[in-house]
Regions:
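Nuclease-adjacent, charged terminal/linker segments that flank catalytic cores
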Residues: 1-80
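Short, solvent-exposed loop/turn segments at secondary-structure junctions
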Residues: 7-11, 63, 115, 147, ...
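A short, highly charged nucleic-acid-interacting micro-segment common to nuclease
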Residues: 77-93
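Conserved aromatic-histidine-acidic binding/catalytic patches
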Residues: 3, 7, 19-22, 84, ...
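Structural motif
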Residues: 8, 38, 104, 168-169
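Active-site metal-binding core of divalent-cation-utilizing nuclease and nuclease-like domains
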Residues: 43-45, 84-88, 97-140, 146-160
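Non-catalytic C-terminal interaction segments of nucleic acid-processing enzymes
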Residues: 1-3, 12, 148-156, 166-237
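Metal-dependent nuclease catalytic cores in nucleic-acid-processing enzymes
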Residues: 94-100, 164-167
Length: 237
C-alpha cells in the first residue's frame, strides 16, 4: 500500500518485488483481496509482448485506510490505458526503484519531483536520489528517457542543470556539496544520441545507461557512461 501511494501504479511483478513476495499465487491472492475490499483498483496497459498487462493503483478508500497520501488518477477502474505516456514512464521509473533495492549502498532518499527545483530554471527531474557513503552525502537527479523528448528540450535541460551547478543554487536543494544527473534511456541508440548531443554542451555532470542495463545488472553497478569516453563507472562516481 505504501509503495502504491509513492509510485502511483504498479504491475503485479513490481508489487511482488517491492513487497518481497516470491510466489505468484501469493501476490495474486493479496491483490485480489485488496481489490474486493476496494482498497486498490485495476487498469490495463500493453505488456512486453503486446498483450494486456494489469496495473494497480490505490483508491481513496485505500489511502484513507492506510493513512497514506492519495493522488487520484483520471482513469475509470478496469479501463484500458494502452499507449498512455504517463503510465509507460511511471512503470519505467518503478523498475529503476526496484533495481535500487538490490544489494548495494543504502538508499537514503527517493523523492519524486512534481515542481521545478529552482525558481530560475523550469526544470523538473523525475526523481532526486540521495545516499550516504562513508559519512558523505551523494545527490543525483534521475531522468528516465523513453525517447519522447526532443533534442532541443534536452539542450534546455542541460543548460538549466549547468546553471544551478555553476551558480551554487543547488545547495538550497540537496544535502551534498555537488550533484550528478543520471539519464536512463530505453535503448542503446537513444543513449548514443543523447550522449553525443549533451557532450557538445558539457563533458561533466551527466551519467548515462539504459533501463535494460539497470534491470539486468543493478542500479548501483558500474554500468554508467559519461558524455565522453568508454569507461563505465558507478552512478555519480
Amino acid at each position: 500500500m505504501k509503495a502504491l501511494s509513492e509510485l502511483r501504479i504498479l504491475t503485479r511483478d513490481q508489487a511482488a518485488a517491492l513487497s518481497g513476495f516470491h510466489s505468484t499465487t501469493r501476490v495474486n491472492v493479496r491483490l485480489s483481496k485488496l481489490r474486493r475490499a476496494r482498497l486498490i483498483q485495476r487498469y490495463f496497459v500493453a505488456g512486453a509482448t503486446g498483450s494486456r498487462c494489469s496495473v494497480y493503483a490505490l483508491t481513496r478508500k485505500g489511502a484513507q485506510t492506510a493513512q497514506l497520501p492519495f493522488q487520484p488518477l483520471k482513469w475509470s477502474a478496469d479501463s484500458v490505458i494502452i499507449g498512455n505516456a504517463f503510465a509507460a514512464h511511471q512503470l519505467a521509473l518503478n523498475d529503476v526503484r526496484i533495481a535500487m533495492s538490490e544489494p548495494g549502498p543504502t538508499l537514503a532518499l527517493w523523492k519524486t519531483l512534481d515542481e521545478p527545483i529552482s525558481p530560475t530554471a523550469k526544470l523538473v527531474p523525475d526523481v532526486l536520489i540521495e545516499r550516504k557513503i562513508d559519512d558523505e552525502w551523494r545527490s543525483m537527479f534521475l531522468e528516465v528517457d523513453l525517447g519522447t523528448e526532443t533534442l532541443p528540450t534536452w539542450t534546455k535541460k542541460t543548460q538549466y542543470y549547468l546553471r544551478i551547478a555553476t551558480s551554487g543554487e543547488y545547495k538550497t536543494i540537496i544535502r551534498a556539496d555537488r550533484f550528478g544527473v543520471l539519464v536512463a534511456t530505453d535503448s542503446e541508440a537513444r543513449l548514443r544520441l543523447l550522449r553525443t548531443h549533451i557532450a557538445r554542451l558539457t563533458p561533466k555532470l551527466f551519467w548515462f545507461t539504459t533501463l535494460n542495463n539497470i534491470k539486468q545488472q543493478g542500479f548501483w553497478s558500474p554500468i554508467w557512461l559519461r558524455p565522453e569516453g568508454d569507461q563505465q563507472t558507478l552512478p555519480g562516481a
